[in-house]
Regions:
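Pyridoxal 5′-phosphate
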Residues: 23-507
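N-terminal signal-anchor transmembrane helix specifying type II single-pass membrane topology
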Residues: 1-30
Length: 507
């Protein structure tokens, strides 16, 4: 009897253990599913955006297992720089460990392997932009800013040229005007409303010897406002640009895509900009590189003012002779290219493509929309808003607003709270955001209703971008920017909104 009892007891205990294991498994599965679903603040969230958020739970898996370097931080500065993944870095350095790479200015085995992977990186970039090497050239640079400087130095300016740019451009785009005026060209800024008129197709009378350049961002980096990419063909194929210039000429278009491409697809077949600048660290955190993508037909017309190793076939010492490389990228990539960083692009694009840029677009829009709705609903006890939000969020249009929520904080009387106070408190909560003007003076000063005279007066009182002066005469000199990206989660949104309520809502 005792043996039978013990056998029955063992079977009973085994059943309990098995049942507990099953219960534990399904409980964890349920909790994971619950976690994958955003805790939405408005009733239609799941029906509107449920299929867009989280890559079917993959975002949480990546955050848990592949981004250990976050260490509990809330990262909300994707427009400043993207985030790399642990596996991305491991695979890149595994590639370095298992292969011998060398200066590509040679035909040695190691150099040949290096060249092959560098060329593969160029092809991957062009494929990402839906074009080929038959139409565009990839010139590697240190950053988007370095790309813009290269273009500024090499563009064929003349006395009759006009450099036209929108107000909401980055400082690095504005800075091109110094090179333009050096060559006798003029510059002019335009507002969005100035670009709404239509142009007429060319009648064949334009002066091909006069080169004009129009620059605008696909998405401006202050508040995330998106521009209409149809402006590219409007300037290229009609006489629209000539209304701004003193002399008719050929218009080229520079597209600053640095803030745009980390969360949006850029199709150069549909929107064939003449020049495109990109920063890869904004796409996927590593490597820290940029590129200038140029139409092949334009490369021969660009000036190469000097030369260096890698850009010439041969030069003489006693007379001014230098035979430049015939290939466009080789002509403008001075010295030895950062080949190890360029090789890393291959693995970095693999990680991005695991998710897909279109899925990243949907996910980041979902996060942005929810963040805006939550922040916009926060009120002081007297009903006054806690934040003033800039941009096109109120349109609720994916095509008009990028993944940025830029704001200024308000007290319960409607006065501004300095952005430095927000930054200090955010640092205390291990929240990564950005404050200031974000190198976009046009968008920043317009948001705060500052004219050029006020800008000159007020900013002459500052000593640096990050000094303590953030409000003068009750007017903010910048703002607070929260930007999201591929790996932002609803948990990040919840933590930031909780932070706002904790520090800035009156009690």
């Amino acid at each position: 009897m005792r043996i039978v009892f013990l056998i029955n007891l063992a079977c009973y205990l085994t059943s309990i253990v098995a049942l507990s294991s099953i219960l534990f498994y399904y409980t964890n599965l349920y909790m994971q599913n619950q976690r994958n679903q955003p805790q939405h603040s408005h009733p239609n969230f799941w029906s509107e955006y449920g299929d867009w958020y989280g890559y079917n739970g993959l975002v949480n898996e990546i955050r848990d297992k592949d981004m250990e370097h976050l260490n509990g931080s809330v990262y909300l500065d994707y427009t400043g720089s993207g985030l790399y993944r642990t596996s991305q870095i491991e695979e890149i350095f595994d590639l370095y460990k298992k292969n011998l790479f060398a200066n590509p200015h040679s035909l040695s085995p190691a150099s040949s392997l290096t060249t092959d992977l560098v060329e593969r990186a160029r092809d991957i970039i062009l494929q990402f932009f839906n074009t080929t090497s038959e139409k565009y050239t990839v010139i590697f640079t240190a950053s988007a800013t370095a790309s813009l400087r290269l273009l500024a130095e090499s563009f064929p300016w003349s006395d009759d040229s006009l450099y036209l740019y929108t107000r909401d451009n980055h400082n690095s785009v504005l800075g091109i005007r110094r090179w333009a005026t050096h060559w006798g060209a003029k510059f002019k800024t335009v507002d969005t409303k100035d670009l709404e008129a239509e142009g007429k197709e060319f009648d064949g009378s334009r002066a091909e010897t006069v080169n004009h350049l129009f620059a605008f961002p696909a998405e401006e980096n202050f508040a995330g406002v998106k521009y209409d990419l149809n402006l590219i063909k409007k300037f290229q194929e009609t006489d629209f640009g000539d209304r701004f210039a003193e002399k008719r000429g050929k218009w080229y278009v520079l597209l600053d895509a640095a803030a745009f491409v980390p969360t949006h697809r850029l199709d150069l077949e549909e929107f064939p900009a003449d020049f495109v600048v990109v920063s890869f660290y904004k796409l996927f955190g590593f490597p820290n590189l940029g590129t200038l993508v140029v139409k092949n037909e334009i490369v021969p017309h660009l000036r190469k003012m000097g030369f260096s190793g890698g850009t010439v076939v041969m030069a003489t010492c006693g007379k001014d002779f230098a035979l430049l490389q015939s290939r466009g990228c080789s002509r403008f990539e001075d010295g030895t290219i950062p080949f190890l960083s360029i090789i890393a692009l291959n693995k970095s694009f693999e990680k991005l493509n695991e998710i897909g840029i279109d899925n990243i677009s949907k996910h980041s829009w979902t996060i942005t929309r929810e963040l805006f709705l939550r922040l916009n609903s926060i009120r002081h006890s007297n009903g006054r808003p806690v934040v003033k939000i800039y941009g096109n969020h109120y349109m609720n249009d994916f095509e008009r607003q990028g993944p940025i929520v830029t704001m200024n904080f308000l007290n319960n009387k409607g006065g501004y709270i300095g952005y430095n106070e927000v930054m200090v408190n955010a640092k205390n909560e291990n929240i990564n955001i950005r404050v200031g003007c974000f190198c976009n003076p046009g968008a920043c000063t317009r948001a705060n209703n500052l004219n050029d005279d006020q800008v000159e007066e007020y900013y002459n009182k500052k000593t640096s971008c990050h000094d303590s002066i953030d409000i003068i005469d009750g007017i903010p000199l910048g703002a607070v920017r929260v930007s999201v990206g591929a790996y932002t989660t609803m948990e990040d949104v919840e933590k930031f909104t909780a932070f706002v309520k904790k520090y800035f809502v009156d009690t």
